[in-house]
Amino acid sequence: MNRLKHYLLNMQSNTTTYREMYDGESILMFPNREPEVQYDPVYWHEDISCEISYTHKLAYSKPTLTWSIPVEKLGFDTVTSAAADYCLRAFIPYIDELNTGLYNRSRPDDENGKYYIHKPGGEVLVRNTAYFALRLQKDYINGSGNTVYLPDDDVSRPPKMCLCIRMQVQLPKGKLRKAIQMLCRDLPAAVDMFIARFDIVKFNQAIALSKKQADIRAWLQKSDYCAFIANGSILPRAKTTDLPLTGAIPFCSTPNGEIEVCGVRGMAIRRGVTVITGGGYSGKSTLLDAISAGIYDHCLGDGRELCITDASAMTISAEDGRSVKSVNISPFIKWLPGGDTRDFSTDHASGSTSQAANIMEAVDCGAKPLLID
């Protein structure tokens, strides 16, 4: 990060563009020919790279940083979306700790500085905030200032598979010393701490869970069932959050509906028409919500880790006032005044016509299970 520090130290204290940091202009010295000017906004902390890019043309003081950490430093070689998801969740506490040290309620973020990183819900998804990619290794030696030297050693430096974590940093206005501390000292130290304390045991548990989820999904595709809810799952969510409800009663299948799938016992829902009945506040909608959420895998601790649903499932609801264009709703509504239900269009659908359109659109898109509350 020496080159980045050089750029920041030589900026005007009242700068608002941070142009030098984004350009990465450096003087490249060759062993046997004249030096050249190159532009490289990738900065190195030992063998870990950090690429700095614009977040928005009107937000120069809020750069986007992409850290690339060789997976060999973390001790694994599994490069799946579940692996990236676990790494993102493991990295977040170190950013939260940095923000705790920066926090000053009397100043806004653009004066005080702040780190931003995506905080996912319980779903395990492919994200552009954490992914794996091949990255080039550092192929130069830092000199003074923005001068770099190409080594004359003919050593091959093939690209390495890296964990890439993307985040943003709000740099404090008019405080370049603090910006240097945030970018060149505190953030690299947090990355080092993340690597040093990486919990490979919990990582392996997350990978094992993702394999179990994939096995159950594969079983659903070949079976007469469209959803599975494992015994012991925590289905209710805490108010206003996606976290499991503290003190909730774990799900338990009825004996006559219980089956075993891939070594896990629970309740499976057959293809066909299934009606969930019960009194008020008995958990009907909670169960249906869990089935709906089962199109996604969930992380350890979410409570719905082994609630698995056919990925094509679609939740159907009435949407008063929505627009409908050229949808055949004749299977549900045979006649409407002033319109052909085989080619129905409106800018303001009623509850019944919007729900009929939702069903037909879902079927046209290939949805198999339809969930209606």
Q: Where is each model-derived feature located?
A:
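N-terminal accessory targeting/assembly segments
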Residues: 1-224, 235
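Short acidic, glycine/serine/threonine-rich loops at helix termini
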Residues: 162, 177-181, 238-242, 279-281, ...
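Structured core elements
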Residues: 166, 227-229, 236, 258-260, ...
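Charged, amphipathic alpha-helical linker segments immediately N-terminal to NTP-binding catalytic cores
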Residues: 208-261
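Active-site-adjacent "gating/activation" loops or surface patches in catalytic cores
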Residues: 245-267, 322-343
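Glycine-rich phosphate-binding P-loop
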Residues: 264-292, 296
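Flexible phosphate/Mg2+-sensing switch loops adjacent to catalytic phosphate-binding sites
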Residues: 297-311
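Switch/coupling sub-region of P-loop NTPases
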Residues: 309-373
